[in-house]
């Protein structure tokens, strides 16, 4: 219990600290947005297939709840993102282009091409990326990474 209290106090101190030059609310500008998960260290998205036409995602991203066929998702640079894939016959890739095959992969992504496992990624630069089935051209969605 003592270790838990110490950890809780440390988390409060770290969470309340701020970088120099900010607005007094930490490095994340205060916006009173209930979906702002700036203190969350990771995002988990469940990925299944809907036939050969769509990936079905559910979970949360920076904008809140995510659910449906091939939804667009948004993250910030440095977020820890885990796609929990259960999609037999549909190899799951994170790419720089919405392309078939195994080319155009984002570097630094673990477990690319899985049909049953976790694909993890910590985006290092802002931009537009894609989650893609390497076999079916209709199975893809847009990933937006912001600073």
Report each predicted region and the residues it spans.
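Sec-dependent signal peptide recognition
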Residues: 2-9
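Beta-strand cores of secreted/periplasmic/IMS beta-sandwich domains, seen most often
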Residues: 70-93, 118-125, 129
